[in-house]
Amino acid sequence: MNLVHGLKWFHNWVGFFITLTMLTVLTTGVYLGSVDIIKRMQTYDQQYSPLTLEQKAQAIDSLFSRYPEMSTVRFPTEHTPYIQAATRGKSIVFDSQLNEVAVRQNSDIPMYGTLFWLHRNFLMGDFGKYLNAWASLIGAAITLVGIYLWWQVRKGFRLKQTIPTNTRSSSLFKSHIQLGLFISVPLFILCLSGYLITYKGLWLDALKSQPNSQISYPASQPSDWLNQLTTAQNLWPDSQLVAISKPRSRPGAESAAELNYSIRFDSHPGVWLREADSITMSYEQGVIQSALKHSDRPLSGKVASFVRPLHDALNMPLSYVVLITLVSVIATIILLFSLVTFYRRTFKKKSRK
């Protein structure tokens, strides 16, 4: 068996079994992506108006006091023109006067929780989570093999074969190859990042930054939001202060005596990865613990910071959510084509004999 025949066997047979899991992941991914798109398109009749530092300080003080369970307060931007307090699975939208405009909870969306965990672990707990991760890694390998196999026969295919003209196996097969080629790169990224999200130990350390004792940061007034935000903004005057986060409180865990807040910035309004620049500050002491821009991270840190955003579009533009949702739709279609052609050529052919 030569290399090409071996890769065809791997792509066909291993791909057939992986397809059964990937169809579940992709169809639920389309649903989750669609929900995210709808959320991001809602403006709640708010017009974007940048807040002053005084308004941001008032918002933080008020919202963290009124909603202690919330872990993040986000300020209006050109992309989301409203104030938002958020924690996992829930967010509250406010107008500029800090009046509640809307409450959004994932649990209120029909079937969201079920489909999310079906996407994450096939509703099978840790076993399903790791099964999903390895299926995603094998899916990434199958994608690379598919690119190689296309390269071997690239001269025999035409752009017009992308859309099948009938339901014959040959037409579906050619469409599978062409469509697969077009989405191969983003599909590979989705598969690989899905694997890495489960195996965080492979990359999480690259995100951790150690405070540099050689850098002396300006001090702020203890327990004074306005003074501390002013200090942080003066450190990066050309950046936009967009969010404040605190560590999420875990049920049953003792509350920390001192909270270090993460003050997050966008380097410019059109930045690809939002909230990527961060200053960590002790609110009680007014002392900056660390300050790190995404552009100052080593290459490993820059790559690691994109692992989750590339998979679920966290802090990424709306256009990226649309892209990966569309990729999931196309991938679902080509996997269905592959199931039909594989069944016809393998099992139906044997039954005729």
Predicted regions and their residues:
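Conserved histidines in hydrophobic membrane contexts and catalytic metal-binding motifs
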Residues: 1-353
